[in-house]
Structure formats: structure tokens, C-alpha cells
Regions:
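Membrane-interface "cap" regions at the ends of multi-pass membrane proteins
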Residues: 1-35, 39-41, 57, 61, ...
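TM-loop-TM module centered on a large, flexible mid-protein loop between adjacent transmembrane helices
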Residues: 78-86, 118-122, 229-292, 310-343
Length: 429
């Protein structure tokens, strides 16, 4: 086949796939969870981001192998169904994935509200945060309902802008870093550092979006593997450097006090008030674009899960040629979560949800490894790493956060079991 024809039928090259992965990860996560990470790990925040990144890197290998074996726009949903069959277990995990995306949306909304409210007088910030976060999800849902194609086209531009600002933040801020603030004497306990890394694990969620584009990638055998590794490694380095500059530039107490807008506060020493404003605006732009991308993707996910007969058929019924019922349910749930739960509970739920899903994907790779001739023990190790990370996260979480997490997992399987009972779909299809 001539190269031009191949390129026409498979329009995404290596750097396009890398852009999908990096754009998915560097959404609003780093802006949302930096302050929380510093609060838990203190001077060890860079190490916490590194540990979370290594767990993501192990899982990226499984995604790479599964994407080549089962290229599909269904991505994670398809991998789990192909490995374990479309039964109650697969359905419950896939519903958990959808709920985890709703939690991610709530996190992005809280981050948007926090950074937007940072420009208000101190006594107006609490109410302002709720107003801004609610307005963000309502307006962006409206854009998706209207099918604003310009929003989709703007995504790449927004990704480029926020990456440029983060790189500028690192480049300018590195000169003012105090090594003493990063010394082991300033770290939390080892268990707290591990738990702190896992509570911000959801900042690495996003690389799996490459799987949804696998059908459109040129030379998938080579491109997918390289795209997964390049995107995750790049983001690990970026996050660690951002954490180094943040913790090395300001006392931990200052970052914790400004937890809702920590990255903007960390820009003050090197860039002054202009830096605070620049990072604040970049955070709002980034989290708004992340809300849009995640809202669109999660609505598509409900459509895919419904097509797999794991959610009601109404969710695969398009309205105006788009799966809007899933979109509206997702948006309504996000508004409720973002306004009711605190950042700690939301981060715990989101990170734990994705750790459970990623452990299952690693197990899916191990279960189907013989089909590819790959070494299953690596994926078993990756699944164990996810499980261990989950255990560390739960061990250091508050009772309230763990209760909400257990409720989310129970709700996932409860929704799936109820649907199967009502629809007459067997528990093991």
C-alpha cells in the first residue's frame, strides 16, 4: 500500500498519539492536586510524583500490548471485556471506570473554582468557588450539547499553551530553588510519601486515551508502544520538576495554606504577582479544557458500555446524532460531587478508582499474554503494584474518604447487577 494511502486511512502518527497521551494527563490534575500532595508528603512531593509515575509506566506497558492486540475505540472497556468476558465483573469494573471519570470531572471543577476564586477578596472565596465550579460544568455541558466543534479544535492549542507555561514556570523558577526545603529531613514518613503519591495518582490518568485512537494510528506495532512510553516519561519528568520548583521555592505551610491554588502561589517568588495571575489563568484554561475533554470522553464511554450490554440501552440511543443522555447524567452527577465532597475525598475516590481499573487492565494483559507471546509476569507485577498502591492509599486515608470509596465501588457493581436483573442479561454473558 502506498504510504500516502496508509497515512490517509490512519491519520495519527507518533507525535499525534503522544499529544493525545500528554494532553490527557496534563489536563487539570497537576493544578488540582499539587497542594494536596505537599500537605501529605511535605518536602517529598517530587518523590511522590515519581512513585505515582512509575506505577503509571508499568500499566502503560499493558495498555501498549492490549492496544495492538485489540485496537478499538472502546479502549479500556474493550480490553476488560475481551479478557474476562462481558459478565458482571467486567460490567462492574467498566461502570467503576465511568464513575471514576465523573470523579475526575469533579476534581477539575473544584480546581477551576479554586483558581478562579483566588482572584476574589478572601471573604468571598468560599462561595465564589462553588459558583465558579458549577458555572464551569453547566457552560461546558451546554457547549457539548450544542456540538461546538470549535471547542474540540481548540484542545490542541490549549494543551500547547499550558505545556509552554509549565515549562516556563520550571525554567524560571529553578534558579530560586532551596535544596534545604527538599532535603529528607523535610519529608513525611515513608508510608505518607507512598500514600501521598497514590492520592495524586489520578494526575497520570489520561495516557489510556491513546488506546481509544489505536484504530487510527499509523504503524500501530511501533507507534503505540513508543507513544505510551514517551508520553508517560515526559509527564513524569514535567511533574517532578514542577514539584521541585514549587516545594523548593516556598515553605510547605505557604503552599498548604494556598492548597486550592498552590501552583499559582508557587509562581510568586520567581515571577511575582504577574506570575500568580499567569498561572491562575493557565490553570483555569487547563481545567476548563480538561472538563470539556473528559465530559465528551465519558459520554462516549457510557455509549460504549451500553453497546456492550453493561448499561441500559437508552444510553446508546443518540440524541441529535450524539450520546447526550450519558452526557447529561455525567454532568449532573459531577455538579453534585464537586459541591458536596472535599478535595481529599475526591482525590482518594478518583485515584483509587483508576488504580482498581488499571490493576484489572494489567490482569487482562496477563490473562491474554499467551496470544501475544508476551511475558505475563511483568503485568502481574504491574497489577500487584496497583494493588499495593491502593492499599497504601486506603491505609492513610480518613474514614470518611474510605467510606465514600467503598460506596463508589459498591454502587458500580450495584448498578451493573440491577441492570442485569431488570434487563434479563445473564451475570456471565
Amino acid at each position: 500500500v502506498p504510504q500516502s494511502k496508509a497515512a490517509a486511512s490512519h491519520p495519527i502518527g507518533l507525535w499525534g498519539a503522544v499529544a493525545i497521551g500528554v494532553g490527557g494527563m496534563v489536563g487539570g490534575g497537576i493544578f488540582a492536586v499539587l497542594g494536596l500532595s505537599v500537605q501529605i508528603t511535605k518536602g517529598a512531593a517530587p518523590l511522590a510524583f515519581l512513585l505515582a509515575g512509575l506505577v503509571a509506566l508499568l500499566t502503560a506497558r499493558s495498555y501498549s500490548l492490549l492496544s495492538k492486540s485489540f485496537p478499538s475505540r472502546g479502549g479500556t472497556v474493550t480490553f476488560i471485556n475481551r479478557a474476562f468476558g462481558p459478565g458482571l465483573f467486567s460490567g462492574g469494573i467498566n461502570v467503576l471506570l465511568w464513575l471514576s471519570y465523573i470523579v475526575m470531572l469533579a476534581l477539575y471543577c473544584q480546581a477551576f473554582g479554586g483558581y478562579a476564586a483566588s482572584f476574589l477578596p478572601q471573604d468571598s472565596r468560599s462561595l465564589g468557588r462553588h459558583v465558579f465550579l458549577t458555572a464551569a460544568i453547566v457552560l461546558i455541558t451546554g457547549l457539548n450539547v450544542a456540538g461546538a466543534s470549535t471547542v474540540a479544535r481548540a484542545e490542541r492549542v490549549v494543551v500547547a499553551i499550558k505545556l509552554a507555561i509549565l515549562v516556563l514556570f520550571v525554567a524560571v523558577g529553578m534558579a530560586g530553588v532551596s535544596a534545604a526545603r527538599l532535603a529528607p529531613a523535610q519529608w513525611s514518613s515513608p508510608v505518607s510519601v507512598i500514600a501521598g503519591g497514590m492520592i495524586i495518582f489520578l494526575a497520570y490518568e489520561g495516557f489510556e486515551l491513546i488506546a481509544n485512537a489505536a484504530e487510527d494510528v499509523t504503524d500501530p506495532g511501533r507507534t503505540l508502544t513508543r507513544a505510551y512510553y514517551i508520553s508517560v516519561l515526559f509527564v513524569i519528568v514535567l511533574y517532578v520538576l514542577v514539584a521541585v520548583v514549587s516545594v523548593g521555592s516556598l515553605p510547605v505551610a505557604s503552599l498548604v495554606q494556598a492548597r486550592d491554588y498552590a501552583l499559582a502561589e508557587a509562581a510568586r517568588p520567581a515571577l511575582g504577582a504577574a506570575g500568580f495571575t499567569m498561572i491562575g489563568i493557565a490553570a483555569m484554561l487547563s481545567t476548563a479544557s480538561a472538563i470539556n475533554a473528559t465530559l465528551y470522553g465519558s459520554a462516549r464511554m457510557t455509549y460504549t458500555i451500553a453497546k456492550s450490554r453493561e448499561l441500559p440501552a437508552q444510553l446508546e440511543r443518540p440524541i441529535w446524532n450524539r450520546p447526550l443522555e450519558g452526557l447529561l447524567i455525567t454532568a449532573g452527577s459531577t455538579i453534585a460531587l464537586a459541591n458536596v465532597l472535599d478535595l481529599n475525598s475526591i482525590s482518594t475516590m478518583g485515584s483509587a478508582g483508576f488504580l482498581i481499573v488499571f490493576a484489572t487492565v494489567n490482569a487482562a494483559e496477563a490473562r491474554t499474554a499467551r496470544q501475544r507471546g508476551s511475558a505475563p509476569w511483568v503485568s502481574v507485577l504491574a497489577a500487584a503494584a496497583c494493588a499495593g498502591a491502593l492499599a497504601a492509599l486506603v491505609a492513610k486515608s480518613t474514614v470518611g474518604a474510605v467510606t465514600v470509596l467503598v460506596a463508589m465501588v459498591a454502587l458500580s457493581f450495584g448498578i451493573e447487577a440491577t441492570f442485569r436483573r431488570v434487563s434479563g442479561t445473564p451475570a456471565r454473558a
